[in-house]
Amino acid sequence: MAASFSVPSMIMEEEGRFEAEVAEVQAWWNSERFKLTRRPYTAKDVVSLRGSLRQSYASNDLAKKLWRTLKTHQANGTASRTFGALDPVQVTMMAKHLDTIYVSGWQCSSTHTSTNEPGPDLADYPYDTVPNKVEHLFFAQQYHDRKQREARMSMSREERAKTPYIDYLKPIIADGDTGFGGTTATVKLCKLFVERGAAGVHIEDQSSVTKKCGHMAGKVLVAVSEHINRLVAARLQFDVMGVETILVARTDAVAATLIQTNVDKRDHQFILGATNPNLRGKSLAGALAEAMAAGKTGAELQALEDQWISMAQLKTFSECVTDAIMNTNATENEKRRKLDEWMNHSSYEKCISNEQGREIAEKLGLKNLFWDWDLPRTREGFYRFKGSVMAAIVRGWAFAPHADLIWMETSSPDLVECTTFAKGMKSIHPETMLAYNLSPSFNWDASGMSDKQMEEFIPRIARLGFCWQFITLAGFHADALVVDTFARDYARRGMLAYVERIQREERNNGVDTLAHQKWSGANYYDRYLKTVQGGISSTAAMGKGVTEEQFKESWTREGAVNLGEEGNVVVAKSRM
């Protein structure tokens, strides 16, 4: 007879620690922070994926700060407004005036990839590109925070009272594109973001294979269920790391024209099908393949596709049913009754499948309805998709339980679209926070808005619930504008262009890069040198002879310098 197994005390202790941590995670999830969050996994799943060495992350402090900031704006009907930062100079200047920082994948793609190979925003750069930029900026934030503390603690109380304190540690929200692949790629990307300093991450519902900038053509969506998997993967990774990183779900459904698959019934009502029975059995992909086999290329293939699409009379299934009802010989009252019945059964929030839709259509007497969503599929196999604000709302409803903010990408700054989206979201998820891209891809002057309306745009949509608003590429455009205009003037007028455009403007506006040695932290590291060497150093960078002393004096345009009769520089008496 086998001896009974006696559980060693070490095993019991291990299980005790595990169960205690599970209870801790469950209590964390029950907090106000996660009251709207749905998870398809358990606290035990999360703890099982953790190692035994507990770690903490500085980005988590900023994530909690970001949450408080956004919830305050939401409660007040205001918005955190920010833009894409390119470098440490921009991020430190932004800290004086804005309460969040954005890191754009577009800007990284064009100016700072891991391989240093620039290109358009196709998310084809290495997946550590944006996390690397986040770290670049986060290190700068921490450095300037340390530098400021050293400077302030070197002042008297009176001096500190007169010197504004700058919060350099503004939370960073970063571009996670599509998650860069499958579930494990998304998990690893999110881990990198947390480690590198991101307080928030946004992930979009485009296909990772065909990903485009939100304002390019040819966007392909993934199924609603696939994007939910991405969001769940991100949340799971944050939970495993024990962080409260903000998760933003973006949808490109407004302008998308294609979708990878018809596997999710929530997408069915927006997929287009051919309604011309003369094309039965004559798919677009087949027609193009035959044309290519016959030697046709380029413009000929495009003309063939355009002709086929025109003949197909593409419609959603609901449009097909509606048109069929209106074309029957029934009385107007009977048509109206059938239309009302159809709309009652097929309203957007019900997300009926195509199979369910066909059953309802047959009950309404439409038994031989021709509608085929496979015929117009592209050569790559994608289905045709009818993008709209309503499509974005339906996706927003599905994403909201798995994200902290919902972002609808748009093609223009349209107040009506914003209002429709906000009302649609709030009808199902009234507490969900919304985000808006104040894109520089929009020609704002062509929007029809007056200057006053442009000025009021941010606060107006903030009152609708868009509590985080950002100009993705303002850092890029500001950089280009300043350098282009200065370079042109410098080529023409030399040093006067620099003095007038840069140095005097820095002085007049109190920009701290005027004293760039101090801004870069020379004083801070002098403190290190002196501390190491007992309080004195003959090699201190900011010691006697540093030219930055010139900026401490009161210079005037008239009294600073003048030229003698022989053209020699004569220093004003105040400097002698």
UniProtKB/Swiss-Prot annotation:
Belongs to the isocitrate lyase/PEP mutase superfamily. Isocitrate lyase family. This is Isocitrate lyase. Its cofactor is Mg(2+). Its EC number is 4.1.3.1. Mg(2+) binds at residue 175. Homotetramer. GO terms for molecular function: isocitrate lyase activity; metal ion binding. It is found in: Glyoxysome. NCBIfam families: isocit_lyase. GO terms for cellular component: glyoxysome. InterPro entries: ICL/PEPM, Isocitrate_lyase, Isocitrate_lyase_ph_CS, Pyrv/PenolPyrv_kinase-like_dom, Pyrv_kinase-like_dom_sf. A motif (Microbody targeting signal) lies at residues 574-576. Keywords: Glyoxylate bypass, Glyoxysome, Lyase, Magnesium, Metal-binding, Peroxisome, Tricarboxylic acid cycle. Substrate binds at residues 104-106, 214-215, 250, 437-441, 472.
